[in-house]
């Protein structure tokens, strides 16, 4: 009866602790520090207003990338990619850890039967056995269990966000590789068409040389340029295979052909260009959203915030280690020295223990200091993450605008050089121009066509980078 009274007394003391300020302080909840400055995007003159509704980040990747073949490819990568599967497994591990942390509030129960045979001076053998059932329960008087549970929950949130980051990176990478394939296909078409034209020009030059109208130097120069186009065709085909292999690796499959649509048929949030009739990216028609409302949804910023949350609870748990730990124990069972038929004597035992650390060779103090420093370090990293996020948005916007502005110039340049090439070729046929002028016109036109295509690709890359920088691609 006295033991029971002592247990009740200890329990009462624990209940009293729940009402004191120290107990509440040790169980304090983390207050999010995710403050995004209003000027996170920068002060560029090209970025003055941020429409608050319909931000680009609110688009799911299926809404953002409307090309059916690209959608199918992204779905296949998300279903089979090794890195994403590993991230999903990491989430499951964190869920198991959180479940174990929640069960720490419950008592542990052990059944440890034992038996023995004994004899004194070769006398009769005495048999005995014990059948105890032991219960241990830690009292969360100073929030150690609570803080560890909350830290485990923060770890789970981090694992989930890391999965989102992997998912967004895969969406971005697949889209970029897909548009790279389209670019290479388009450049291969340009080079193939150029190959046919230059081959015809080369045959004309050979005929003129055979008739003594030009020197062999002209033929050699033309053939050299023609062979250069041939090598570019080989390089482009090789690059196509490399990109297809890279996508195959993302699919966790052996190298294979990647189906894609034709250049210019893929749809992205764009604006029709009134000058050329083409569709091109324009920051004026892209809703990016207010930084405080958009950037806080970026997975890397949420990851940094959850890391600070985990560090906060780890610091709380480290602080709780300075205070006593209280444990309740109980044992119930029976023992018998005369076999198993008669249960013999019933065993009952109950006790409470309190352990107050006095000297632990500085381990507790060191752990607390390390936890505090980790928390401070993560706070600084969070600020840097926000700065980096705003910088990425600014850079992507600048790239979009640059590609948009250059497109009209490239388009006009191609038109002018095509006219120059046709005119120069006609002049040479009439003997009013030489092969060097024709050769220069041909090479200039080819380079302008390739540059125009590359600029279109850079525009696509920029809008994808902006989409990811605003937190898109996770859903």
Model region roles, listed by residue range:
Residues 85, 105-127, 136-169, 185-187, ...:
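Small/polar (Gly/Ser/Thr/Ala-rich) solvent-exposed segments
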Residues 236, 299-300, 378, 455:
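Metallo-beta-lactamase
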Residues 70-72, 128-132, 176, 221, ...:
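Transmembrane beta-barrel architecture of outer-membrane proteins
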Residues 65-112, 127, 134, 138, ...:
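Intrinsically disordered, glycine/charged-rich N-terminal periplasmic/extracytoplasmic linker segments
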Residues 2-79, 237-296, 468-475:
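Terminal intrinsically disordered/low-complexity segments used for targeting and assembly
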Residues 74, 132-134, 178, 291, ...:
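Membrane-embedded beta-strand positions in outer-membrane beta-barrel channels/transporters
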Residues 86-101, 166, 172-190, 200, ...:
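Amphipathic alpha-helical coiled-coil segments
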Residues 154, 161-290, 399, 423, ...:
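Periplasmic alpha-helical coiled-coil/stalk elements that build and connect Gram-negative outer-membrane
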């Amino acid at each position: 009866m006295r033991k029971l009274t002592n247990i009740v007394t200890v329990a009462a003391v624990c209940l009293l602790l729940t009402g004191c300020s120290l107990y509440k302080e040790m169980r304090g909840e983390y207050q999010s520090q995710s403050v995004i400055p209003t000027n996170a995007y920068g002060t560029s003159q090209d970025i003055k207003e941020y429409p608050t509704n319909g931000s680009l980040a609110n688009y799911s990747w299926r809404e953002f990338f409307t090309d059916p073949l690209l959608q199918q490819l992204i779905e296949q990568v998300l279903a089979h990619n090794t890195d994403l599967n590993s991230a999903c497994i990491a989430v499951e591990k964190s869920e198991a850890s959180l479940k174990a942390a929640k069960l720490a509030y419950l008592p542990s129960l052990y059944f440890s039967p034992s038996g023995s045979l004994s004899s004194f001076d070769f006398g009769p053998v005495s048999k005995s056995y014990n059948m105890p059932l032991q219960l241990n329960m830690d009292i969360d008087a100073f929030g150690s269990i609570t803080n560890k549970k909350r830290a485990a929950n923060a770890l789970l949130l981090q694992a989930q966000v890391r999965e989102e980051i992997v998912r967004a990176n895969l969406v971005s990478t697949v889209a970029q590789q897909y548009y790279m394939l389209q670019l290479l296909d388009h450049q291969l078409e340009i080079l193939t068409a150029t190959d046919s034209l230059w081959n015809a020009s080369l045959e004309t030059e050979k005929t003129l040389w055979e008739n003594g109208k030009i020197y062999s130097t002209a033929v050699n120069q033309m053939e050299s340029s023609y062979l250069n186009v041939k090598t570019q065709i080989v390089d482009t085909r090789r690059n196509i295979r490399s990109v297809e292999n890279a996508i195959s690796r993302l699919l966790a499959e052996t190298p294979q052909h990647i189906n894609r649509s034709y250049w210019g048929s893929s749809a992205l949030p764009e604006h029709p260009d009134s000058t050329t009739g083409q569709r091109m990216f324009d920051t004026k028609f892209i809703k990016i959203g207010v930084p405080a409302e958009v950037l806080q949804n970026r997975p890397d910023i949420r990851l940094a915030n959850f890391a600070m949350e985990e560090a906060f609870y780890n610091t709380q748990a480290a602080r709780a280690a300075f205070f006593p730990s209280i444990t309740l124990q109980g044992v119930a069972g029976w023992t018998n020295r005369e076999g198993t038929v008669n249960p013999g004597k019933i065993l009952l035992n109950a006790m409470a223990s309190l352990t107050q650390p006095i000297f632990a060779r500085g381990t507790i103090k060191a752990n607390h200091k390390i936890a505090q420093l980790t928390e401070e370090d993560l706070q600084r990293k969070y600020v840097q993450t926000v700065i980096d996020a705003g910088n990425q948005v600014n850079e992507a916007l600048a790239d979009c605008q640059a590609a948009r502005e250059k497109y009209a110039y490239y388009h006009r340049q191609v038109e002018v050089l095509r006219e120059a090439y046709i005119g120069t070729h006609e002049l040479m046929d009439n003997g009013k121009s030489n092969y060097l002028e024709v050769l220069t016109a041909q090479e200039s036109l080819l380079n302008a066509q390739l540059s125009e295509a590359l600029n279109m690709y850079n525009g696509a890359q920029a809008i994808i980078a902006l989409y990811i920088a605003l937190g898109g691609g996770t859903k």
